[in-house]
Amino acid sequence: MARTDRDRWDLATSVGATATMVAAQRALSSDANLIDDPYAAPLVRAVGIDVYVRLVDGEIQPGTSEFDPHRMAKGMACRTRFYDDFFLDAARAGVGQAVILASGLDARAYRLPWPAGTVVYEVDMPDVIEFKTLTLADLGAQPTAQRRTVAIDLRDDWAAALREERFDTQAPAAWSAEGLLVYLPEQAQDALFDNITALSAPGSRLAFDFVPDTAVFADPRWRAHHDRMSELGFEVDFNDLVYHGERSHIVDHLSGRGCSLVPLFRVG
């Protein structure tokens, strides 16, 4: 089903299911030297999407496609490590606020060794925030930083909601928009970065990833992956979840607002 302007979801439906997919890929990572996320698999099981539960429980064998979930997990492990290092490098440099936009099943507030006094803000849909908070509490997990949740749709006035949770606009912050941008319409994407710029004190940092051309989700190789996941019982079509069409180039958008940008890598 195609997106609508005011659509909503939980972690088992629509865009929310992509957060569960990402958590499953983190759980599949076998290299403990790269990432360590002990909460990924329990969170996936708690959501209960059958195909991802079977994946993390080892009931689905690796395939040969480049989009096979097991192969994609290797890329997700690298992405996760990049953002882990981004936040910890910022924190060690004295940046005491971290803001995780569209936090999903991200457990960095619980699993990273944050310096004392660090405040981690998680911004996501109310149902997503509530589910993760309650599930991690049931697991006995304790945050390793001061965790503050902002339960709001990123298409709404999340900046005001963030300030209400005592975000300090006079202190630098580290921001992440991980795996997020393709799920926002053009206006919301531009507003997202304008808000980040307006809220950021000197010394703030921002990390994000983006897909230059969403036509990749209609590529025959990706469609083969979709068909394979459908065979396994997962019916969400990612081509229906992303916003297609022209939008501002993020690098140009931020450069025009005085940001210093460092491209780290490009895939494809």
Swiss-Prot record:
Its EC number is 2.1.1.-. One of its GO terms (molecular function) is methyltransferase activity. It is an enzyme of class 2 (transferase). GO terms for biological process: methylation. It comes from the Bacteria. S-adenosyl-L-methionine binds at D124, D153, L154. The keyword Nuclease does not apply. InterPro entries: Ppm1/Ppm2/Tcmp (IPR007213), SAM-dependent_MTases_sf (IPR029063), SAM_mthyl_Trfase_ML2640-like (IPR011610). Keywords: Methyltransferase, S-adenosyl-L-methionine, Transferase. PANTHER family: S-ADENOSYL-L-METHIONINE-DEPENDENT METHYLTRANSFERASE YKTD-RELATED (PTHR43619), S-ADENOSYL-L-METHIONINE-DEPENDENT METHYLTRANSFERASES SUPERFAMILY PROTEIN (PTHR43619:SF2). Exhibits S-adenosyl-L-methionine-dependent methyltransferase activity. Belongs to the UPF0677 family. This is Putative S-adenosyl-L-methionine-dependent methyltransferase MAP_0663. It comes from Mycolicibacterium paratuberculosis (strain ATCC BAA-968 / K-10). The lineage of its organism: Bacteria, Bacillati, Actinomycetota, Actinomycetes, Mycobacteriales.
